[in-house]
Structures are given as C-alpha cells and as structure tokens.
C-alpha cells in the first residue's frame, strides 16, 4: 500500500483541485494516473442542478457510447416465441421465461443486464426483490423493457450504459478504459453529456450541469471545464 500511496500522492500534487481543466488536459492527467497493473476504468461524476428528493426531477436513462465501454457484458432476456429467437440471434447469452425466472430465484445471476419483452412482465414483476437491489430490474426508461429485444441486446453489447442520479444529485458512469485513445474517451463523454442534457427535467431551474469530474479506478478526481466540452 505504501507504493500506491506514494504514487497517488505524487499524482495528486500535479492536480489543482480548484482548477477547471480543458477536456484534453483532464484526460491526459487521468490516463497518466492510471498506472495500476490492470486496465483501469475511466469514470465520470456529474453534479446536476436538480432536487433528487423530488420524483419529477429524478434523472434516469441510457446511452450507447460510440467507442464502447471496453467491457464484455452477458445479457439475459425474458422473451418467448419469435422474440426469444430474435434475442438469441442478436447475441443474448440467456433467454427464457419461467425457466429463467427459476434460475434467478435460485441465485444464478451470471449476467450483467436483463432485458424483457413487455408481455413477460407478469413473470419478471415477481423478481423485483431479487433483481432490483442488484440494478438488474428491467425498466422502460432505460430501454430494457421493450418489444424490440433484438435492438436492446445489440445496444447492450455495443456499449450501452445506464445512468441514474443518486441522492446527492450526482450521476456516476464509466466512459471507457485507460487503454482507450483520448479521442474515444472524449466522444464517449460527449455522448453521455448529450444524453444527460436530453434527460433534463422540465422542473429543473438554474444551472443544470454544475460540475464534471474525471478519475480512474485508483486515481484522484480532475475537474473538467465544461466550455471545452461544448467546443468539441
């Protein structure tokens, strides 16, 4: 831990916590810090100008990152008949109905995303206490309850990320890996910011995107000048 501490201390000394860095410089600093022995994720935290306690200001949605996430995902789909075949053809690892529900109840959750056709919600609805706490419960707001299960599977495989504001009014998301080129990370961040803008609640007043900060898994936060994002 001593080496890690010294590394982080050295990096932290390079970062001015009060400064807003242009996106290219911010990405350079974050990638420089990502020197662990694994391919660290590059994460973003966005402080929103909303009241997360108000139900009409809960920001939630999904976006397909143009450069992907760098992570392989296993997809489970609740579907039957033709839609089940479409889900399999699109690349879903697990497809079923009551049999899949029994698998979930048995604790066999070897998948990262769950998608459901609307006509299967009578089955999926009984699994809320299991899937909900794990962030796996299908929801139409993020595109995981849909009649077009094939497209949903393809989006999940292509690098779709879901986002939901926390109690502090902050969105947390992963926009790639340290091994990504800066241009790929920048395009992913822009896609996320665009999606957040589109998801802005009508009742939100004042500045909506208040703060944007980047970090790697084992790194420190670097604040981003939002004007540099708009200039891309």
UniProtKB/Swiss-Prot annotation:
InterPro entries: Ribosom_uL1_bac-type (IPR005878), Ribosomal_uL1 (IPR002143), Ribosomal_uL1-like (IPR023674), Ribosomal_uL1/biogenesis (IPR028364), Ribosomal_uL1_3-a/b-sand (IPR016095), Ribosomal_uL1_CS (IPR023673). Keywords: Repressor, Ribonucleoprotein, Ribosomal protein, RNA-binding, rRNA-binding, Translation regulation, tRNA-binding. It holds the Pfam family Ribosomal_L1. GO terms for biological process: regulation of translation; translation. This is Large ribosomal subunit protein uL1. PANTHER family: 54S RIBOSOMAL PROTEIN L1, MITOCHONDRIAL, LARGE RIBOSOMAL SUBUNIT PROTEIN UL1M. Belongs to the universal ribosomal protein uL1 family. Binds directly to 23S rRNA. The L1 stalk is quite mobile in the ribosome, and is involved in E site tRNA release. Protein L1 is also a translational repressor protein, it controls the translation of the L11 operon by binding to its mRNA. GO terms for molecular function: rRNA binding; structural constituent of ribosome; tRNA binding. It comes from the Bacteria. It comes from Paraburkholderia xenovorans (strain LB400). Gene3D superfamilies: 3.30.190.20, 3.40.50.790. Part of the 50S ribosomal subunit. GO terms for cellular component: cytosolic large ribosomal subunit.
